[in-house]
Amino acid sequence: MNILYILGNGFDKAQKMATGYPDFYKYLTDKVKNESALLGKMKSAITENTELWSDMESGLGEFTSATNNAEEFDSFYFELSEHLQNYLKKENEKFAPSDKLKNKFQSDFTTVSKYLGALDKERYNAFINRHSFSSKDISVITLNYTDTLEKILGLSPNI
């Protein structure tokens, strides 16, 4: 049987990590003082709709008209990316999963049915009983920029 898990930012947030856009925006506005003129303009211009990462993406889309200079915009983009990487690195370093969390997570990975509702659990069990699976192959796609999953599973972040 093949099982695929797709993990996004909600996974990190469920681990109590401050990896949402509001957290990064607060970091940008409170902590980043030595900045380019363009980043300063962006921080001043994007003050509303700071709840979702898509809000930042939309704001950046609108903000591209702030310069007609591609080189200046590239520099701004890499500056913003560097701040994001530094922020996520600090958040990532704070995360140290307990043995209890590691064990629970590994158990959850292999016994998905315990989180299903009654009807879905019934269908799942009927499906499993109809087929004879000799093994479970579990794949994970993570869309996060942290190594939260690797820490929980005890894996090298460089795989």
Protein language model regions, located:
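Alpha-helical structural modules in large enzymes and assemblies
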Residues: 12
